[in-house]
Amino acid sequence: YYLRSLADGTLGYSYKKSAAVALLIRERLGYTLQITIPAVLLSAALGLSWGLVCGYRKNSMGDRLSTGSLIVLNAVPTFVIGLVLMLVFCFQSRLLPYAGLSSSGIVKGSPGYTLDRLRHLALPVLTLTLAALPNRYLLVRNMAAQETDEKYILYAKQRGLSGRTIRWSYLLRNIAQPFVNMLGMSVSVCVGGSVVIERIFSIGGMGSLLTEAVYTLDYPLMQGILFVTTCIMVLSILLCDLICVLIDPKRRREGAK
């Protein structure tokens, strides 16, 4: 029965909610992706640029402060980050809303709808970005710090090239593949991390749906969510492998042969 439901695309039937599993997931998946995709891109951009600078200037005061701070941040649970941000930006400064994805009275398609949605997404995206940033930064920083002792980097410095040129034209080439591979593996972690974030900020995404399925022992729904999450992880890893082929001349030549 389950294989037949996979073949016809329904992913089973949820008797607790009286609906096809695929329909329930389709309604919620978009909300989770609105949080996960910006967080993955932001944490990747920040981790890459910040890690390159600190790795190139290893053992400097800025490197020590940045690395120490992010090691501490890496030990902080995601829900603590979310609660602290909520306390600061929602209850003290009242700059951002603390729950949901839209304000009451805002109709989809109205002039203020997009801005209202962005304001509601700001804190969940920032929370997931801060939770994912330390791993990206530490990977890039450590690889860049090791590469700075290589002969080609020393030769580039002797030629009088600027630090910016060395970082983005030399260091980046050698750390790009491990970094891209790590991003592929971390997409599923971010999707899993959205479970906590969606509960904190009252967002009805995949994480909330999975929590409801666990509480009600809705096994078909749990199976469907895990299946979709696994497919997302596999597709992200495949996409990252294709990107690695494009950025690595050696692998491109091997593929051509």
Regions from the language model: what does each represent?
Residues L6-T10, L96, C190:
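A short secondary-structure junction motif
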Residues L3, P77, D241:
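Residue-level signature of catalytic and energy-coupling elements of molecular machines
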Residues R26, T67, Y98, W168:
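Phosphate-coordinating loops and pocket residues in cytosolic domains that bind phosphorylated ligands
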Residues K16-A20, G100-L101, I106, Q158, ...:
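Short capping/connector residues at structural and topological boundaries
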Residues T10, Q92-S93, L217, K250:
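A general structural signal marking secondary-structure boundaries and capping sites
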Residues L29-G62, K108-K257:
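Alpha-helical transmembrane segments of integral membrane proteins
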Residues G68-V76, V80-L133:
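Membrane-water interface segments at transmembrane-helix boundaries in multipass membrane proteins
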Residues Y1-L48:
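An internal, D/E-rich "acidic patch" concept
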